């Protein structure tokens, strides 16, 4: 089955040449993109969709979410809005609610959140464990996550449970818990922050998970300067997320991890910015402009979670990046598409063949497409808060 999407006013490919095509057309063949070019030269297809002069983008790639949970934390949110500062302790509230919820209901809730994200243009997403915090419930979360998300990350090292010894809990994370979740996950993460896991504990988690053959990610530098960025670069993590508080040495280390990379070769560590979380916690926005200017690739992600960023709107993140972080529209869209793919090692090139590539529109790539109800992507920031998703294709299937 083939589908021709024609009369596209603006096609932001996010391919290697960063091409933006005008009056364009795209052909989907099965799950893949089979043709791109001018509307006037478009081939026939089994089905035809008139884009009506709208803009077409790659689907959003949301590389940082926490979707496996029950309950909410509205009381914590209200307290924070009243002036209380954010700390990681609220994670325990969600852990209690999640442990008390059945597999069926956890799956139902997670699927609802995925559907909400897809309806807004997200076509590829990662999610984490981290609200189980014991072997049984982390394994349960990992298993459920593997049925609802494209990429699953083990975050047993999210918070030390109340009453537990931090080093003994780290032993558990690196031993029995890791062994139990491993069949369901491909990534591992650690919350390297004051009040969560210190440098020594974080190093142990990263080493154990690396030895288990997992890709690495780090929650780092959210609440203050610390060792998170340095550890992420040292261990070759795919991304370090939050990055609100960076020293000059942190920025230099991130930039240095990409030295010599020109779309091929050894990748460095992506800096993943989470602007919706920054606004909700009233933290300084991550320095996306400064990172880009220093040569550090960035990703934008929703950090959808019940405590600090209960949104799946990648468009909101793009809008915030443009209006508050001083990114151009093109830079923000790229960070929310290709940048997310790079943070998940799913960008085209290197060891990723075209059929596995996401975050860009190119022949042979997965047909993840987001049609806006606007003539250009500029409208995402120009008309903030307006729902502009008109149609979505996920792996070639019309999802909206």
From Swiss-Prot:
Zn(2+) binds at residues 64, 66, 219. Gene3D superfamilies: Metal-dependent hydrolases, Urease, subunit C, domain 1. Fe(3+) binds at residues 64, 66, 219. GO terms for biological process: L-histidine catabolic process to glutamate and formamide; L-histidine catabolic process to glutamate and formate. One of its GO terms (cellular component) is cytoplasm. Binds 1 zinc or iron ion per subunit. It is found in: Cytoplasm. Its cofactor is Zn(2+); Fe(3+). GO terms for molecular function: imidazolonepropionase activity; iron ion binding; zinc ion binding. 4-imidazolone-5-propanoate binds at residues 73, 131, 158, 222, 308. The keyword Iron applies. It catalyses: 4-imidazolone-5-propanoate + H2O = N-formimidoyl-L-glutamate. Pathway: Amino-acid degradation; L-histidine degradation into L-glutamate; N-formimidoyl-L-glutamate from L-histidine: step 3/3. Its EC number is 3.5.2.7. PANTHER family: IMIDAZOLONEPROPIONASE, IMIDAZOLONEPROPIONASE-RELATED. HAMAP family: HutI (MF_00372). Catalyzes the hydrolytic cleavage of the carbon-nitrogen bond in imidazolone-5-propanoate to yield N-formimidoyl-L-glutamate. It is the third step in the universal histidine degradation pathway. NCBIfam families: hutI (TIGR01224). Belongs to the metallo-dependent hydrolases superfamily. HutI family. This is Imidazolonepropionase. It comes from Arthrobacter sp. (strain FB24). The lineage of its organism: Bacteria, Bacillati, Actinomycetota, Actinomycetes, Micrococcales.
């Amino acid at each position: 089955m083939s589908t021709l999407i024609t009369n596209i006013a603006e096609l932001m490919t996010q391919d290697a040449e960063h091409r933006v095509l005008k009056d364009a057309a795209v052909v989907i063949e099965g799950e893949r993109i089979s043709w791109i070019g001018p509307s006037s030269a478009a081939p026939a297809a089994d089905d035809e969709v008139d884009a009506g002069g709208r803009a077409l983008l790659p689907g959003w790639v949301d590389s940082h979410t926490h979707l496996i949970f029950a309950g909410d934390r509205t009381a914590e949110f209200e307290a924070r809005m009243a002036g209380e500062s954010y700390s990681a302790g609220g994670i325990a509230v969600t852990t209690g609610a999640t442990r008390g919820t059945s597999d069926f209901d956890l799956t139902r809730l997670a699927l609802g959140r995925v559907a909400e994200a897809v309806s807004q243009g997200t076509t590829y997403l990662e999610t984490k464990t981290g609200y189980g915090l014991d072997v049984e419930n982390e394994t349960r979360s990992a298993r459920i996550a593997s049925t609802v998300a494209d990429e699953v990350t083990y975050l047993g090292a999210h918070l030390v449970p109340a009453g537990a010894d931090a080093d003994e809990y780290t032993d558990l994370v690196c031993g029995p818990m890791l062994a139990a979740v491993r069949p369901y996950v491909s990534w591992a993460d650690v919350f390297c922050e004051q009040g969560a896991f210190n440098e020594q504990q974080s190093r142990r988690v990263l080493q154990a998970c690396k030895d288990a053959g997992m890709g690495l990610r780090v929650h780092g530098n959210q609440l203050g300067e610390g060792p998170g960025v340095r550890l992420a670069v040292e261990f070759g993590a795919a991304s370090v997320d939050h990055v609100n508080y960076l020293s000059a040495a942190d920025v230099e280390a991130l930039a240095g991890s990409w030295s010599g990379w020109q779309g091929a070769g050894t990748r460095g560590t992506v800096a993943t910015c989470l602007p919706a979380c920054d606004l909700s916690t009233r933290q300084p926005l991550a320095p996306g402009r400064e990172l880009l200017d220093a040569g550090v690739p960035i990703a934008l992600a929703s950090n959808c979670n019940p405590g600090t960023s209960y949104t799946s709107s990648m468009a909101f993140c793009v809008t915030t990046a443009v209006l508050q972080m001083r990114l151009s529209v093109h830079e923000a869209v790229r960070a929310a598409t290709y940048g997310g793919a790079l943070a998940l090692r799913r960008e085209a090139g290197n060891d990723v063949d075209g059929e596995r590539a996401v975050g860009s529109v190119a022949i042979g790539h997965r047909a993840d497409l987001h049609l806006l109800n606007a003539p250009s992507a500029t409208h995402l920031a120009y008309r903030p808060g307006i729902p502009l998703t008109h149609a979505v294709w996920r792996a070639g299937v019309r999802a909206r």
